[in-house]
Each structure stands twice: as structure tokens, then as C-alpha cells.
Regions:
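C-terminal helix-rich "cap/oligomerization" subdomain common to oxidoreductases
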Residues: 1-33, 100-102, 252, 319-359
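N-terminal Rossmann-like dinucleotide-binding module
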Residues: 2-80
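Hydrophobic residues in well-ordered beta-strands that form the structural core
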Residues: 126, 151-153, 282
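Predominantly a Rossmann-like dinucleotide-binding segment in NAD(P)-dependent oxidoreductases
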Residues: 157-230, 238
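NAD(P)-dinucleotide binding in Rossmann-like oxidoreductases
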Residues: 235-242, 251-321, 328-335
Length: 359
């Protein structure tokens, strides 16, 4: 079993600051509204720790943990008061007391865990990128359908309340026609060590699956349909993974999406969604809880707040529980994830980025 993937240090620091900001607040009673499921996690790295910490804010805890290194799983369980430590993932899958599994391992291992967990009748929340490519996601979706369980992508932007509120207003016609989505995401990763996961082809490294998924997800959420035209330029490094890219997309409604990505330079995580009546600016968009609307007619600025950054992972888990309880709007989120995976698969093919599992 692979150890859980490591989050960027800047993201880790931001998460710690967000947790600290809500430590003494009562947990909102409108997040976990569906019947509670019994969860186990596969992997116990940075993002798994964030999930356990998020749940602690809600007075909840994971029921089980499995990891390639048993001692790490035992330490993780002790730290967070988790009852069950599994020696193998097969033991986890066989446990009838576990309803749902949260997969936090490296991208290239996801499909192996997805196949087995879904076939065992477990609902699954899987970290981004949910799979390496569209073929793997289609396969996982088919297994979920066959076994009547929920598969959900954990990309944060699909679950943050801010995007739900902005889309509600967009769909109501408040903003007019959407014309252009512009998104940047730059993260400086030291290039000297080509064995780290960001540049490691054997760990499905590269900008697209690590940071591009956020930008393309926001773009797709605001577009009326999946882009049919995609043009791009991408740079790769000596290990064969993508390190930067410029992407332009257009759909049948003539809406444009423009995305820039890089692992070699810091850029603001900034999105600007432009409409007839206004533009919406969202900074730090992967876990955003605030947006600014600038109205075209008079230039006045409207501040929109929805959700809380610190609860980002709770929203993911809550959405899966709502989907299991019958909320079709949450089940439909996988459709957006599928569209994004289709775009990422095409872009990597255009750039010549192929992982060992795809050869």
C-alpha cells in the first residue's frame, strides 16, 4: 500500500492557520445534515491528518485507518482516537462496520483502491486527482453503479458552499451571460530534487494532476457545457512530467476558459469569471469562502461570503453522506469531475505526458 501523498507546504501552513481561526467557534449545525456514516481512511499523510483534524472540530472521528506502514497507521490512530487499525486494506474492505472509505494515497494508486473498495460495497471519497485518466474514472464509475454505491471526487471546489451560492445566482440570471473564465495557479517547487512527487513520473507527478485540476474544475463549474475546443502549450521536464501550461477552451455557447499553470513560479491562485453584468474575483480559490463581485453598471463591489475555509474537508465528507441519503445534486458532482478528467487526459496527451501505468 502506498503512503499518502504530501500536500504543498504553503497549503499545509494555510490549513493550519484556517484551523486555528475556528478552534474556539461552535461547529456549524448545517454541514453534517445527513445520517452519519462510519468512515475509514487509506493513507495517513498530510491530507488525511487534515481530515481527522477537520472532523475533530465537528466532534466526529474516523472509525478506521489503513496504511502501507502499520506503525504509521497505529500512530495516526492513537493521535486521533481511531478505534480500528487494519493490517491490510483487504481487512478494511471486509469490515462490515465500515460504510465509507476516504482514499488519500498518490494519484497513480487510486484506481487500485477504488476497484477494490467499490466492489466491496463501500462508498468512496477519493482525493484529487481521482484517477490518472478518463478510462480509469469511467471504470470506477461503472463499478460504483454496479454495486449501488457512491463515488465522489474530493476536489475541494466541487464542495465549497461559495461555489454553490455563486452558481445558484448565476443560474437565476443575476450575473447575465458568462463570457470568460480566467484562472492562474503557480506553485514554486524546488527543481533540484527530481525524485520528489511533483516531478516524479512514477508517482504521477506534474502540474496538471496536482494543481490544474483545481483551475479546470472552477472553469467547468461556471461554463454552461463541456468545452469542445481545447488548444494549449505545455512544458515538460527531463522526467517526462508537465511543469507548466497555457490552456484556452471554448464550448458550444462560445464561452471561453483561459488557464495558466506552473510549478516553477509562484502565481496568485486567482480566478476572474466575467459576465455581462459583472465580474467575480475569487482569490485562493481551491478552498475559497469569499468572492468579490464588481458590477459593470456602476462599479460597486459586493462581497459574498459562504462557508468556511477550515471546514473544506468536512464539506466533502458531508456531500458524500448527503448523496448516500438520496441527494441527487451531490451525486451529480461526479459529472463535473468526469468532464475535468476528460480535459486533463486530452491535455496530457497533447503534451506527451504518459505515466508508466498508461504505457
Amino acid at each position: 500500500m502506498a503512503d499518502s501523498k504530501q500536500a504543498p507546504l504553503d497549503a499545509e501552513a494555510a490549513a493550519k492557520a484556517a484551523f486555528a481561526s475556528v478552534q474556539d467557534r461552535p461547529f456549524p449545525d448545517d454541514i453534517f445534515t445527513a445520517p452519519e456514516l462510519r468512515w475509514a481512511v487509506i493513507g495517513c499523510g498530510v491530507i488525511a491528518n487534515q481530515m481527522a483534524q477537520s472532523l475533530a472540530l465537528a466532534g466526529r472521528k474516523l472509525a478506521g485507518v489503513a496504511n502501507r506502514t502499520l506503525s504509521k497507521a497505529q500512530a495516526f490512530a492513537e493521535q486521533y482516537g481511531i478505534e480500528k487499525v487494519y493490517e491490510t486494506v483487504e481487512d478494511l474492505y471486509a469490515d462490515p462496520d465500515i460504510d465509507a472509505v476516504y482514499i488519500t494515497t498518490p494519484h497513480n494508486t487510486h484506481i487500485t483502491y477504488l476497484r477494490a473498495a467499490l466492489a466491496a460495497g463501500k462508498h468512496v471519497l477519493c482525493e484529487k486527482a481521482i484517477t490518472l485518466n478518463s478510462a480509469e474514472l469511467d471504470e470506477a464509475s461503472a463499478i460504483a453503479d454496479e454495486h449501488n454505491v457512491v463515488l465522489m471526487d474530493a476536489t475541494t471546489v466541487l464542495h465549497m458552499p461559495l461555489y454553490q451560492e455563486l452558481r445558484r445566482r448565476m443560474d437565476a440570471g443575476d450575473f447575465g451571460r458568462m463570457n470568460l473564465a480566467q484562472l492562474n495557479f503557480g506553485s514554486y517547487k524546488e527543481y533540484g530534487d527530481l525524485t520528489n512527487r511533483f516531478y516524479n513520473r512514477c508517482l504521477a507527478g506534474g502540474a496538471m494532476l496536482d494543481i490544474g485540476v483545481y483551475a479546470l474544475s472552477v472553469m467547468r463549474l461556471f461554463m454552461a457545457s463541456q468545452p469542445a475546443e481545447v488548444v494549449s502549450l505545455g512544458n515538460t521536464c527531463e522526467t517526462g512530467v508537465d511543469v507548466a501550461g497555457g490552456i484556452v477552451c471554448r464550448n458550444a455557447e462560445q464561452q471561453l476558459g483561459v488557464v495558466s499553470l506552473t510549478l516553477h513560479s509562484k502565481q496568485p491562485k486567482r480566478s476572474v469569471i466575467s459576465f455581462d453584468k459583472c465580474y467575480i474575483e475569487i482569490n485562493e480559490y481551491p478552498r475559497a469562502d469569499h468572492a468579490t463581485i464588481v458590477w459593470t453598471a456602476d462599479g460597486h463591489r459586493e462581497e459574498v461570503h459562504a462557508g468556511t475555509e477550515a471546514y473544506a474537508l468536512c464539506y466533502e465528507m458531508a456531500d458524500l453522506e448527503k448523496a448516500v441519503a438520496g441527494d441527487d445534486s451531490k451525486r451529480e458532482l461526479l459529472g463535473y469531475a468526469s468532464d475535468v478528467m476528460e480535459l486533463m487526459t486530452k491535455l496530457r496527451a497533447d503534451w506527451g505526458v504518459v505515466y508508466p501505468e498508461e504505457e
